[in-house]
Amino acid sequence: RDVLGSRGLGDVYKRQGLDFVRGADRAAQLSALRTQLRLARERGLPVVLHCVRAFEPLMRELAASEPRAVIFHGFIGSPEQARQALAKGYCLSFGERTFASPKTLAALRGTPLSQLFLETDDSPVPIAEIYARAAEAKGVPEEVLQRAILDNYKRIFTGGEYEGPGRTKGDK
């Protein structure tokens, strides 16, 4: 905490998670994640998570830490994994890779607008194209999708009153 000082969590809470493919020590990753989740919870910050072949361990850590809000960045999981995350009130963010995978496209289609984000990450595809393709996949007008994602952003990142992951006062 002393290292962060008055700077806050900045990028610490934005890019945390688990990657069980790249060979980094799993115990070290879990330890770092626990620290980051604790700090985010103490400061009331949402967490944006990177998850590569570590869905179950990551879900266990989230259950133990109960962060204010959770967004799975670059989600490329199965529809079942999406259902598990969505049932906890977490949000899913999809990008260009979504459209190359039938299972991830099914996960996008099953994600409620109130729990959806879109991203480019490091893709050269413009965000406008990702919005257009996602709107088509979900069968909604692009303007409806844009408004829903803007509402999600405001709810999670601009200081609303939260009552658990992905929920604000008044949500049912």
Language-model segments: residues:
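Short acidic/histidine-rich active-site segments
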Residues: S114-P126
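Mid-to-C-terminal alpha-helical segments outside catalytic/metal-binding sites
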Residues: L39, Y131-K172
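Short, acidic/turn-prone active-site loops that include or flank metal/cofactor-
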Residues: F75-I76, E96-A100, D121-P124
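Single conserved hydrophobic/aromatic residue that forms the stacking wall/gate
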Residues: R1-Y13
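Divalent metal-binding pocket/active-site signature
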Residues: D11-K88, F99, A106, G139-E143
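Short, structured coil segments at secondary-structure junctions
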Residues: G8, K88, T111-P112
